[in-house]
Amino acid sequence: MKQNKINNITKKQKTILIILFTFRFINSKQIQQLLNHKDHRRINSWLKDLAEKEYIERDFQPVFGTLTKPAIYFLSVKGRDFIRKTYFVDDLYLARLREDRKRSKAFRIRCQIVVDCFLLLFPNQVTEYINVINTWLDQGFKLNKPKQIQFVTPAFYEDLDCTLTSLLKPDAYGYLKNTKGITHIFFLILDAYIPKMMLRTKIQHIFTTLEEESWENDEIRSLQFYIVCPNNVLIIYLKRMLPTLLESFSSNIEVGFNLATRNQLYKRRQNPTDKTGWINLPSTEY
């Protein structure tokens, strides 16, 4: 950690800035879950104070006659400056955050779905994740937990020993190492109105990259792609398209595609013990 004396915000508020740096756009309820804090009023008080002190910006447009949705937050110029002066972070990633005020609604929603993927798919890691991020920022990035999927956002991609993250640019990444080898996991969040032609191009780019780039080594056991779709229409489209691509793909390493809708993912909110119900399409079956 760099030396940066800032005394006008609390330790919890500094943690909130780290969360925003990690996930970019995140709503107040998600922040509350990541902080593992029971009092939402306290969370809102910290956020209000940070906004008034211009460390963060608030994206909130109330619609008359509808239920109030939680406000969305992202780092301001002052917040980014705090991160830059306090931690050793990737300057290129931090530079991209300068344009966050101009980001589309679809991009902001995608960032929040990434948060939900972590909260819903890895509930046993939520309470310790803030400490994990703090360690990465203070002591340097390191994936050192065997037999456990470690969840990584684009904030830390430059530190990863995985060339595919920079080539495929997934919305989030997971790393699993056990006695059988390494599994690289890529999370892709599809926008609500993505054209089918654009989706086809996106999927074909994955296969082109895997065929043309040098990424295989003896340690890698498999590549797994988890695609969160906005509806069943795209699930059906992918189920028709992927088998043909998997049949023509040649590799000693298993490549799997796992499909689910947002609604399937969010069912775990009501019953965390329920399985998401991913549709699995592994290359070993083609």
Which ranges hold each PLM region?
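Nuclease-adjacent, charged terminal/linker segments that flank catalytic cores
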Residues: 1-102
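Non-catalytic C-terminal interaction segments of nucleic acid-processing enzymes
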Residues: 17, 217-286
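Amphipathic alpha-helical segments that form well-ordered structural scaffolds
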Residues: 30, 116-123, 205, 209
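Amphipathic alpha-helical dimerization/coiled-coil segments
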Residues: 83-135
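Inter-domain helical "communication" segments and dimerization helices
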Residues: 87-99, 141, 151, 156, ...
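Active-site metal-binding core of divalent-cation-utilizing nuclease and nuclease-like domains
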Residues: 118-119, 127-182, 194-201
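Alpha-helix termini
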Residues: 123-127, 176-180, 210-220, 246
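Catalytic cores of nucleic-acid endonucleases
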Residues: 169-170, 190-244
